[in-house]
């Protein structure tokens, strides 16, 4: 063990290996089998998942992935690799003995394999950074579960730090604010990934984190309450999710006199299917068809310099 080497595990949700129906089916099965995501009784849910949902959704989702796939592969994985390399370069420039690895909760590279690589490299400590600014049991906690699984085969468990959330981190808030320049009469919509309403009732404080992030960004930009709002996207199934829903809101705003909209997905650290297809394309079409005049998607922070600096400072605080 190198007593001076620090390991950093960047963690995100994951992506299929390729935009094909079999690959997407494997990915969705792993994702939707996580009880942190869907907490229905296992036998009942697995029957529904395997015989009703996967056969129907896999080809549809594969088609959507093909529309956003690039020469570098999945946008989420490509951008996550850029973030990993940018952070590694940052610590190298600072002459800090830090090794940055990337792991995904679902798909490849897995969190378990990333954990194993760090331990085999002889790190004396691991800092786990889930790339979810706002804590949720459906995302952040799943990272901790996977990291713990990665330690099960280790005789010696190295010390570790787990960054719980950074929804109100000043550098993260500033990085978001720096990407936003509202035009005249343009309203800002913060679209966060939704979770079932029941999860909030049971103690998940994700919506409070989302609201705090949006409020801090709005304050940084000196926006009035009428200039911005928070909605939730990507609901799944028949259960009630956090509201207001992004799609329904965008379809009704034009009739309320809001003709120009800028949408930012502040909870997504990297652009992915939910931002590039659902928000940048599908919801844009719905808003314009409902009478909107201008719809602008503000890209995720991805690997931009402000974002990398914010993440680096979060890590440095734990070294």
Swiss-Prot record:
Reaction equations catalysed: heme b + 2 H(+) = protoporphyrin IX + Fe(2+)
The keyword Iron is assigned to this record: yes
Major localization class: cytoplasm
Family matches, as Gene3D superfamilies: 3.40.50.1400
CDD domains: Ferrochelatase_C, Ferrochelatase_N
Enzyme Commission identifier(s): 4.98.1.1
Metal-binding as UniProt keyword: yes
Binding-site positions, Fe cation: 193, 274
Location of this chain's protein in the cell: Cytoplasm
GO biological process, one term: heme biosynthetic process
Enzyme class (EC, first level): lyase
Alphabetical keyword list: Cytoplasm, Heme biosynthesis, Iron, Lyase, Metal-binding, Porphyrin biosynthesis
Similarity comment: family membership: Belongs to the ferrochelatase family.
Name assigned to this protein: Ferrochelatase
Species this chain originates from: Actinobacillus pleuropneumoniae serotype 7 (strain AP76)
């Amino acid at each position: 063990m190198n007593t001076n080497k620090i390991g950093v595990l960047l963690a995100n949700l994951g992506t299929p290996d390729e935009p094909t129906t079999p690959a997407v089916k494997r990915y969705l099965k792993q994702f939707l089998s996580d009880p942190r995501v869907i907490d229905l009784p296992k036998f009942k849910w697995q029957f529904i998942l395997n015989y009703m949902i996967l056969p129907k959704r896999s080809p549809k989702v594969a088609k959507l992935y093909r529309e956003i796939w690039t020469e570098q592969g999945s946008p989420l994985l490509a951008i996550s690799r850029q973030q990993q390399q940018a952070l590694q370069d940052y610590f190298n420039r600072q002459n800090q003995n830090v090794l940055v690895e990337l792991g995904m909760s679902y798909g490849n590279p897995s969190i378990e394999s990333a954990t194993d690589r760090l331990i085999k490299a002889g790190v004396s400590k691991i800092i786990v950074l889930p790339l979810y600014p706002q804590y949720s049991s459906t995302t952040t906690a799943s990272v901790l579960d996977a990291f713990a699984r990665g330690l099960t085969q280790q005789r010696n468990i190295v010390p570790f730090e787990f960054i719980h959330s950074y929804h109100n981190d000043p550098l993260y808030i500033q990085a978001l604010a720096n990407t936003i320049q509202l035009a005249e009469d343009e309203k800002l919509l913060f679209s966060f990934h939704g979770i079932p309403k029941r999860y909030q009732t049971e103690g998940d404080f994700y919506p409070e984190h989302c609201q705090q992030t949006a409020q801090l960004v709005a304050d940084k930009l000196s926006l009035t309450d009428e200039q911005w709002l928070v909605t939730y996207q990507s609901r799944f199934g028949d259960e009630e999710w956090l509201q207001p829903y992004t799609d329904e809101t965008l379809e009704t705003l034009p009739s309320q006199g809001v003709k120009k909209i800028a949408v930012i997905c502040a909870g997504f650290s990297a652009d992915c299917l939910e931002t590039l297809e659902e928000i940048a394309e599908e919801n844009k079409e719905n808003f314009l068809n409902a009478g909107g005049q201008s719809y602008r998607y503000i890209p995720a922070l991805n690997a931009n310099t402000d974002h990398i600096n914010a993440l680096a400072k979060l890590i440095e605080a734990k070294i």
